[in-house]
Amino acid sequence: NAYPRTKDWGTKMEEVSLSSFRQNIDWQLNSVFHLVQLLSIHMKEINQGSVVNIASVYGIVGNDFTVYEGTDMTSPVAYSAIKGGLINMNRYLASYFGKNNLRFNCVSPGGIQHKQSSKFIKNYNAKVPMKRMGTPEDIAPTVSFLLSEKANYITGQNIAIDGGWTAI
């Protein structure tokens, strides 16, 4: 979802070098562009295909830094730039390749529980309407649906799977 990363990933914005910021953009956004460029050649030949990109709620809404209070975590500046860029590039791709019957969609998960501190989890759960972090099992069914023929008229969409985070 956000790998690889530079060593200063997760440090304060003021401490991130421009070269590091650029490297993260290259690894995590430009790589998607390059992959889609290569995939689209084959997908156009067979006149079908579906791509689901994984974005984030932080590509949709601004960061709530209060969930990081009392932890050694923060939300990296590059993360929001990458995820917001991915959502909008996805819209472009859907528009550009629609005539070729190619579909491009995104899912934007909220916080996914994975080895975060108990303080962060408590802070996060207090903010999200469903009062819990998500799991990969919460995300997978939507991705599977978007890749399936049942979604053959859905393109250019970004679906927030976030326990209500973006609803408030």
Positions of predicted regions on the chain:
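A conserved structural motif in NAD(P)-dependent oxidoreductases
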Residues: 128-139, 150
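Short alpha-helical oligomerization interface
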Residues: 8-25, 71-74, 123-125
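Short C-terminal tail/terminal secondary-structure segment
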Residues: 144, 155-168
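Catalytic loop of short-chain dehydrogenase/reductase
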Residues: 2-6, 16-18, 52-85, 90-99
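Alpha-helical segment proximal to the catalytic Tyr-Lys
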Residues: 41, 95-96, 152
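Catalytic Tyr-X3-Lys loop
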Residues: 14-34, 48, 52, 79, ...
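Hydrophobic positions on the long internal alpha-helix
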Residues: 31, 35-39, 53, 89-90, ...
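Short, small/polar-rich loop/turn modules that mediate ligand/substrate recognition or access, typified
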Residues: 48, 98, 103, 154-156
